């Protein structure tokens, strides 16, 4: 079977729902304890999920709306607080403290994040006042509507001591971020419809900006993928969530798709549990519209087992 573009269709696994009743889950991440953690935007909570039973428990309350998650080398959780543009740190006693104030270097809400093994956090922002525009018109689509022309945004590095540095500009809605074994940082540009790569230097600077994967025809029907959350899939491959088609695609450097997961509704974030075969975790919801997502609990965690890529 081939796609309309003539490419061989990638094998597709169908996900099953393991947890529902959420508002809008994002940033599925495996913690040092092996549990799965997600941010539920409109419940203002970080949830800890036991991957053996799929039971969820509140782990942190984030009134400013939680997003990206990661851990310092000592095991303390970092979580992006979107609306007040702070990076929070969960202490051993469960309290949240400010790890870094991002307000001076971000435009609009702070967004998704990746924390590397050295404890450096890499976080994007919206680039404009997305939520302010929606207050004026709750049904507007400031990102993809017919009159949408969002400005570009930045990527910020937060060092373990809380020092904040802008490391990249001109990104078209930087979203999910991950680091490959060779030191390549990959950033999903949602509005740009691509994955952009940088080389991370020893001192944490980003060099060699380049296109890692053009996703303009990478969808199941040869249509474009507007990448949201991403996760390392092993080697030079990345899982990419696809809100448009509903599901996730495993993308190699250069843009080839060699596996897909089909979900029951749009997929806004993806993670990987280190099982054999790998468990691909998809955060899905009926819509990303904040008004609708906050009013209804359509959010789900859906999973599928996908064998590792050959080679």
What are the functions of these language-model segments?
Residues 2-23, 209-213:
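A short helix->beta-strand "capping" segment at the edge of beta-propeller domains
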Residues 1-13, 41-43, 148-154:
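Blade/loop signatures of beta-propeller domains
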């Amino acid at each position: 079977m081939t796609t309309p573009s003539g490419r061989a269709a990638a094998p597709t696994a169908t996900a099953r729902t393991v947890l529902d009743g959420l508002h809008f889950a994002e940033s599925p991440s495996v913690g040092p304890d092996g549990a799965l953690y997600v941010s539920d935007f409109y419940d203002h909570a970080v949830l800890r999920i036991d991957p053996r039973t799929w039971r969820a428990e509140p782990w942190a309350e984030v009134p400013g709306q939680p997003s990206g998650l990661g851990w310092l080398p000592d095991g303390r959780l970092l979580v992006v607080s979107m609306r007040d543009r702070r990076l929070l740190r969960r202490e051993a006693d469960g309290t949240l403290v400010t790890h870094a104030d991002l307000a001076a270097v971000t435009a609009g809400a702070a967004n998704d994040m990746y924390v590397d093994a050295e404890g450096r956090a890499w976080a994007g922002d919206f680039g404009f006042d997305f939520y302010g525009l929606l207050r004026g018109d709750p049904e507007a689509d400031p990102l993809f509507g017919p009159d949408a022309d969002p400005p570009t945004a930045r990527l910020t590095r937060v060092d373990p001591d809380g020092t904040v540095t802008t490391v990249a500009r001109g990104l078209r809605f930087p979203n999910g971020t991950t680091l490959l074994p060779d030191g390549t940082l990959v950033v999903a540009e949602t509005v740009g419809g691509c994955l952009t790569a940088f080389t991370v230097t020893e001192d944490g600077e980003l060099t060699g900006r380049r296109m890692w994967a053009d996703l303009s025809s990478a969808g199941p029907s040869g249509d474009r993928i507007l990448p949201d959350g991403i996760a390392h899939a092993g080697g030079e491959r990345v899982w990419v969530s696809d809100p448009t088609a509903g599901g996730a695609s495993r993308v190699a450097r250069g843009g080839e798709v060699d596996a897909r997961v089909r979900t029951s509704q749009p997929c806004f974030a993806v993670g990987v549990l280190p099982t054999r075969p790998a468990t691909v975790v998809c955060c899905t919801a009926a819509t990303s519209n904040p008004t609708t997502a906050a009013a209804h609990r359509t959010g789900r965690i859906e999973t599928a087992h996908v064998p590792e890529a050959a080679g």
